[in-house]
Amino acid sequence: MPDGMPSSISAYLIKTNGKNILFDAGLGQKANGQLLNELSKVGITPEQVDYVYITHFHGDHIGGMLTPEGEKVFTKAEVYVSRLEKESDLGKGEQAVKMLEKYADKLHIFNFGDRLPEDVLAIDAVGHTPGHTAFQKGNLLIVGDLMHAMALQLPHPEYCANFDGDKEKAVASRKRILEYAKQNGLIMSGMHLPY
């Protein structure tokens, strides 16, 4: 395949009430991330992003928060991160520390169950990382890295990817969130799920 094949999405954009909400920021330009190119295709500049909600601090989710020179990409965005994720060892990693420092003036810390701007609900999805978060907006549930292999993990939520830091908690989160989505008729989207 000379052009390759997309294998995952590491960011989602929702346009609502005149606001642009970004869920995660992908790999970033330094790692050949495509977020800025994709945003421009729908007429969105980084300055037009109002909110960034971070599911967790892995590089394929926060790498796009900074330019290759280490500056803010989303200069006007309010950034929301989980208290548990920020206080975990991941929150002390070099990439996360740089991102948190650059966005300190626009940084907001949330707890699970909090309602964030534009009526986005932060949902406990721990296991993949200590503060891994799913976000619900209306009937859409963005589950981050809750699953890495949907065809396998949907019928067998007890199966874990090597990337899950606490496999027991990851399994419990998967089972709980899958049931929650089913009971509430939610559309589930994730960073490593087919679309």
Set out the residue ranges of the language-model regions.
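Conserved beta-strand hairpin/beta-sheet module of binuclear metal-dependent hydrolase folds
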Residues: 1-41, 134-146
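Short amphipathic alpha-helical segments
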Residues: 64-67, 93, 154-156
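Cap/insert and terminal regions of metallo-dependent hydrolase folds
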Residues: 130, 139-195
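Metallo-beta-lactamase
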Residues: 41-44, 75-124, 129, 169-185
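Extracellular/periplasmic catalytic domains that process cell-envelope and extracellular macromolecules
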Residues: 5-6, 15, 72-74, 182
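Active-site metal-binding motif and surrounding structural segment of the metallo-beta-lactamase
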Residues: 32-80
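Active-site environment of divalent metal-dependent phosphoester hydrolases
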Residues: 29-30, 57-64, 88, 129-133, ...
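Active-site neighborhood of phospho(di)ester-bond hydrolases with catalytic His/Asp-centered motifs
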Residues: 22-25, 50-60, 80-82, 124-127, ...
